[in-house]
Amino acid sequence: MSTIRCDIVSAEKEIFHGEATLVVATGELGELGIAPKHAPLITRLKPGKVVVTTANGEHLDFAISGGILEVQPQVVTILVDTAVRAQDIEEAAVRKVKEEAERLLANRGNTVDVAEAQRRLTEATVQLQALERLRRNLKH
């Protein structure tokens, strides 16, 4: 089976490096599926999920805060601010961040940075969705 190398990296560390048969991410204009021999491409990614299907058929879910996706003939590179594997998400901590962001947005005054609260809310929601997908997949 044909594969393409996939690298998911942040400024701090390499999050994933390996061979993939398919990489799915959400671009600004919708969902993208990148398979081997895909045409070169560069696009911005929305906060959301990235799913990497490895050469052995395993599906790896990542929650990302947004970023850039670049496709070259032999490699897909995803540059992100933050990314978390679904299995590494601490649900209680993420729920606390989400609730705090919702509270700040509901009671906003002059001191609340609305953009930052919305960013936190989006990031927490994406992480919780990735965790839920992981749980559903484990049940099957």
Swiss-Prot record:
Q: Which Pfam families match?
A: ATP-synt_DE (PF00401), ATP-synt_DE_N (PF02823)
Q: Where in the cell is it found?
A: Cell inner membrane
One Gene Ontology molecular-function label: proton-transporting ATP synthase activity, rotational mechanism
SUPFAM superfamilies hit by this protein: Epsilon subunit of F1F0-ATP synthase C-terminal domain (SSF46604), Epsilon subunit of F1F0-ATP synthase N-terminal domain (SSF51344)
Keywords carried by this UniProt record = ATP synthesis, Cell inner membrane, Cell membrane, CF(1), Hydrogen ion transport, Ion transport, Membrane, Transport
Top-rank taxon of the source lineage equals Bacteria
Gene3D superfamilies linked: ATP synthase delta/epsilon subunit, C-terminal domain, F0F1 ATP synthase delta/epsilon subunit, N-terminal
Report the membrane topology from the UniProt record.
Peripheral membrane protein
| Cellular-component GO terms for this entry | plasma membrane; proton-transporting ATP synthase complex
What subunit structure does UniProt give?
Answer: F-type ATPases have 2 components, CF(1) - the catalytic core - and CF(0) - the membrane proton channel. CF(1) has five subunits: alpha(3), beta(3), gamma(1), delta(1), epsilon(1). CF(0) has three main subunits: a, b and c.
**Protein family per UniProt:** Belongs to the ATPase epsilon chain family.
Q: What is this protein called?
A: ATP synthase epsilon chain
Q: Which organism is it from?
A: Xanthomonas oryzae pv. oryzae (strain MAFF 311018)
Which taxonomic lineage does the organism of this UniProt entry have? Answer: Bacteria, Pseudomonadati, Pseudomonadota, Gammaproteobacteria, Lysobacterales
* Gene behind the chain: atpC
